[in-house]
Amino acid sequence: MKFTLSWLKDHLDTDEPLEKLADKLTMIGLEVEHIADKSKTFAPFTIARVVSAVQHPNADRLRVCMVDTGETSDKGDPSYIQVVCGAPNAREGLISVFAPPGTHIPGKNITLGVGTIRGVESRGMLCSAAELEISDDHDGIIELPADAPVGAGYAEWAGLGDPVIEINLTPNRQDCTGVHGIARDLSAADMGRFKDPTIKPVTGEFPCPVKVTVEDASLCPGFALRMVRGVKNGPSPEWLQKRLTSIGLRPINALVDITNFMTYDRARPLHVFDAKKVHGDLTIRRARDGETLKALDGRIYTLDPNVCVIADDKGVESLAGIMGGEETGCDETTTDVLIESALWSEINIAQTGRRLGINSDARYRFERGVDPAFMVPGLEMATRLVMELCGGSPSENVVAGQALPEDRVIDFPLSEIKRLAAIDVPLVEVRRILGHLGFMVAGSGPVVKVAIPTWRTDVQGKADLVEEIVRIVGVDKVPMTPFDRGEAPRKPVLTSIQSRTRKARRALAARGMVEAVNWSFISRTQAELFGGGSSELALANPIASDLSDMRPSLLPGLVAIAQANADRGFADVALFEVGQIFRGDGPQDQFMAAAGLRRGIASSAGLGRHWSGSATANALDAKADAFAVLAAAGAPAAALQIATSHESKNFPAWLHPGRSAAIQIGPHNVLGYFGELHPRVLDELKAEGPLLGFEVILDRIPEAKQKPTRAKPVLELPAFQPVSRDFAFIVDRTVKAADIVRAAQNVDRKLVSGVTVFDIYEGKGIDADKKSVAIAVRLQPRDRTFTDQEIEAVAGKIVAEVAKRTGGSLRG
């Protein structure tokens, strides 16, 4: 909503400065978004007279002008300024607008300087209206009347120094879509005296010859009409044109400008028909299928029964409450007019506007609701303006429907102010505030009766009245009161899955990976490659064709990001994402997952090249990433099992079957997968490989058993030096190293403090179907140093246990 300061003062008698008015508007809920003060922009521009204009010696289309800007020399003689001008209307005696060097020209976004044009010095500029951004006219420089005072400031003389205020209205404040309503609120906030003159009815001189029929009162609760004969339409007066141009509206003619003025001044949209172009009487009805209307915007709209229209005997003439028709529009030949003031269904106006794609000032106000009691007074006010500006004789009013709404009264306990806002406002102040806002307060006890004005349809209850009082008193007066916390929460603030999500992010970031955040939607092709693509996961209205399905995995998005980086020269990436994936349309099919992707030399040992050599990422890096997530999320490390593609059920097809594995607890609870992505999948995704990745389902990690809280035991540092023994076992190639480690650990958990794999060998000296796995076993004595016999005994048990569980034998 835009308006000028002078326009506001038409309704508010105030001497308050602009800054204070703007601050108060924001404080009372009418947020000021922008103030355009053209007086500062136009300050350097002055009125000047062209004393002489001669042909430029070196250019056919330029003239050298001597300009009188009102300045004088030390002797009191006029001091003329030389300006080179290319405007076709530059001539001797012309009064125009002059800009001296150093002036910023808004229409060209340049700052003037003293220049030389084709060998002739120019010390300023004569300006066109387009260069000042006051109109689109750029055919010549501005021509001012002969009596314009030379040397005076142009903005002040032309009335362009009026600041334009733009406020952001909330949808409930339809009463402030007019300057009149804004002034009312400011008067309640002690910013001045509200001007609310009585609108006197205009006496009709003859019956209105056009009758009105409302077929559906739910679409049109009220409709008022009046004819004015013998009008003379033409340009509107200067004051009205300035009002409209100041807020960005283009003056058209007096009749149309009056309706636009009423829309912004009193929040009362109107429409004016050329009465001679209307055939018969008017009917407010639903449009019929296939009916069309060429509206005032020049577009042809095809209508249906959901659209409310104003029709005559010939057909549709107007889209009710939104836009009039071109055929019955007013022009300079119009002599008889029909002025319409009506009430429309807010819901129907909004639906019709959206369906037809029309955003008009009338729609903006009608879909929020207008003052029903101002329907007829608005018609009277518009009639008087038409008669003052265009002349003519008015008819009597024709009113159809119920124009006046029922009275609304609220029983308002004054204690509600203290209860809801924690401030004390005396009854005298309550009466003053509500009275200035248009409410009527009756009674003097603890409970008063408040009559709601017709223009405040948003006020429905006691809390709304408290809000009205508080916003005028000042929201800054409401004390800060903390909520009563009661007992401290006993349960953790974060849920288990929230805690796991946070820990997973930290663990992967600590491993040098960079977090990515992708859409939860991917293309159908990507979804099918990663086990999705079912119809129940397809979006009914996707925002793009490549975002059509809910993602079954986080990896497609990471692959796309990795390839995008590679295309820009950053091939070595280490990425991760933590987010939701979807395996079905039920709540039980939605999981929180953590996934990561490595490429090139972005291994877990570090990203980028190094003087000591750089190994490329492999499946073991992806495994380490997955295990880091599981450890951070609290997965039981001793229970984790690695299963190959042949051992795990439903192994995903997007992984390389020989270079990947599943992580599970038992045969049925698969926590995730790691390894190299299948080359076929990468080809489908147009991504360069190899890519190593993992995905862990955080929801499937079993909850740790709750144990009674107890103090940690005293730290016992071993008094004796540990002993390390190395073993190399020959086993089948299908045997997992983890099985050998587990077998060694199970020999004696009190003595065996650690088992690690330090070598795996396949090749010369080893059968083709065998491999050598070397482990280091750490033995920690507790109460005394081991003897050689005791160490050999434990070593024998380790060899026997490994042979029993894996069929392996010591390498000779």
Curated annotation (Swiss-Prot):
Mg(2+) binds at D458, D464, E467, E468. The keyword Transmembrane helix does not apply. The keyword Nucleotide-binding applies. It is an enzyme of class 6 (ligase). Its EC number is 6.1.1.20. It is found in: Cytoplasm. Its cofactor is Mg(2+). Pfam families: B3_4, B5, FDX-ACB, tRNA_bind, tRNA_synthFbeta. Binds 2 magnesium ions per tetramer. Keywords: Aminoacyl-tRNA synthetase, ATP-binding, Cytoplasm, Ligase, Magnesium, Metal-binding, Nucleotide-binding, Protein biosynthesis, RNA-binding, tRNA-binding. GO terms for cellular component: phenylalanine-tRNA ligase complex. Residues 405-480 form the B5 domain. PROSITE patterns: B5, FDX_ACB, TRBD. GO terms for biological process: phenylalanyl-tRNA aminoacylation. InterPro entries: aa-tRNA-synth_II/BPL/LPL (IPR045864), B3/B4_tRNA-bd (IPR005146), DNA-bd_dom_put_sf (IPR009061), Fdx_antiC-bd (IPR005121), Fdx_antiC-bd_sf (IPR036690), NA-bd_OB-fold (IPR012340), Phe-tRNA-ligase_IIc_bsu (IPR045060), Phe-tRNA-ligase_IIc_bsu_bact (IPR004532). Residues 39-155 form the tRNA-binding domain. GO terms for molecular function: ATP binding; magnesium ion binding; phenylalanine-tRNA ligase activity; tRNA binding. Its main location: cytoplasm. It catalyses: tRNA(Phe) + L-phenylalanine + ATP = L-phenylalanyl-tRNA(Phe) + AMP + diphosphate + H(+). Residues 718-811 form the FDX-ACB domain. NCBIfam families: pheT_bact. Belongs to the phenylalanyl-tRNA synthetase beta subunit family. Type 1 subfamily. Tetramer of two alpha and two beta subunits. HAMAP family: Phe_tRNA_synth_beta1. This is Phenylalanine--tRNA ligase beta subunit. It comes from Nitrobacter winogradskyi (strain ATCC 25391 / DSM 10237 / CIP 104748 / NCIMB 11846 / Nb-255). The lineage of its organism: Bacteria, Pseudomonadati, Pseudomonadota, Alphaproteobacteria, Hyphomicrobiales. The gene is pheT.
